Amino acid sequence: MAAKKVVKQIKLQVEAGKANPAPPVGPALGQAGLNIMEFCKQFNERSKNQMGLKLPVVITVYSDRSFTFVTKSPPAALLVMKALGLQGGSATPHTVKVGTIKRAQLEEIAKTKMEDLNANDMDAAVKIIAGTCRSMGVNVE
């Protein structure tokens, strides 16, 4: 059997367990001619253990209108805000600091993100997350 032809890839960020046909999911999938409710059911089932987090999802659309999707780990900035209990980062990160994060918290976030990061080892992953923290106005200890 020949491999299916990939027509399109759609990248979205959807809250775990709360995918529904409303924007942004509905219009993006509708344009590709996909069954929106089928995606919503599968995504909600797969992501129900990560409720409350926005998950990046990459949907691969095939020529026969079937699809597959891969959920990634939540954005690093979201995990940092959750760890520190923040609503958002600093508008001026180099002058106004909004919090301080410890090395242990960075390592925990890096473990969660490791499969999606372009890092060879844990130390490199921690440095990537630390850079995200600095750009948000969070001090790194």
Curated annotation (Swiss-Prot):
Keywords in alphabetical order: Methylation, Ribonucleoprotein, Ribosomal protein, RNA-binding, rRNA-binding
Molecular function as annotated in GO = large ribosomal subunit rRNA binding; structural constituent of ribosome
GO cellular component terms attached to this protein's record: cytosolic large ribosomal subunit
**How this protein is processed and modified after translation, per its record?**
One or more lysine residues are methylated.
Q: Which GO terms describe its biological process?
A: translation
Which Pfam family is one of those matched by this entry? Ribosomal_L11_N
Keyword Endoplasmic reticulum among record annotations:
no
Q: How does it assemble?
A: Part of the ribosomal stalk of the 50S ribosomal subunit. Interacts with L10 and the large rRNA to form the base of the stalk. L10 forms an elongated spine to which L12 dimers bind in a sequential fashion forming a multimeric L10(L12)X complex.
Record family assignment: Belongs to the universal ribosomal protein uL11 family.
What's this protein's function? Forms part of the ribosomal stalk which helps the ribosome interact with GTP-bound translation factors.
Protein name listed in UniProt: Large ribosomal subunit protein uL11
- Give the gene symbol: rplK
